[in-house]
C-alpha cells in the first residue's frame, strides 16, 4: 500500500482547512498528503457563521456579513453593534469548491474513502474526527434551520437576530436565530441547549413553521434548503487508535 508523509483524517471544515493552508504555504512541494473522507462528492451541507476576529482566506465564500444584531426576550428587543467584529456566514458549498479546486492542482495530494487503503505507520497523522460518545444525557446544542425565500421584500438584511428567546422553553434553553441574506432570503433556525432525551424538542419542522408563520407573521414563502446538527457542550472522550497523531 502507498505511503504518505501526511495524512488528514476527515475532509470536513477542519481537515480541508489544514490541507489548504499546507498547500498555499508551499509545505507540500516535496511532501505527499492523503485526505481520508468517506463522501464521494461535496455539496452544500452546512452554514458556518462566526464573529470575524481576524483576517481569513475565505472572504470569497462569505455569503453575508452584518454589523448589527438583535437579541430578544419576551416584550423586549436589544439592539447591538458588532462593527469591530462583524458576523459572517460562510456557504459550505463555496468553501468546499474553493479548497478542492486548489488541492486538485497538486498531484501530491490524494483522497481516499478509508484509511485501510493506505499505509499510515510512517506518516504524520492529523485526526479531525475525534471519537465522541453520543450520550444523550449530556448537554448538547442541537438545531435545525431552513433557508426560505419570499416573493416580496420582507427582511431587513442590514441586521440579524442572534437569539430570540420569546418562544416555548420547555424547561430547557431554546431560541430562534434568523440570518437575512437579502430582503427576500433568510436562514431561520431553531436551537436548543439541552440533553437530547426529550423527543418533544425534536419537532424541528413544526417549531420552525410555527415561528415563521405566527411569530414573523410570514405566510407566503418557500423552503429552499434545510440543515440540522448537534454540537456537544461537554468535554469529549478521545480514543486514540493510531500512532503519530
Predicted features along the sequence, with ranges:
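N-terminal Rossmann-like FAD-binding beta1-loop-alpha1 element of flavoenzymes
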Residues: 4-34
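Short, well-ordered alpha-helices that flank and scaffold nucleotide-derived cofactor binding pockets
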Residues: 20, 24, 101, 180
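N-terminal FAD cofactor-binding segment of flavoenzymes
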Residues: 21-24, 34-74
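Conserved N-terminal helical subregion
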Residues: 65-134, 141
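Predominantly flavin-linked oxidoreductase catalytic cores and closely associated redox partners
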Residues: 109-216
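Flavin (FAD/FMN) cofactor-binding core of flavoprotein oxidoreductases
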Residues: 217-241
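Conserved small/polar residues in nucleotide/adenosyl-binding loops
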Residues: 243-245
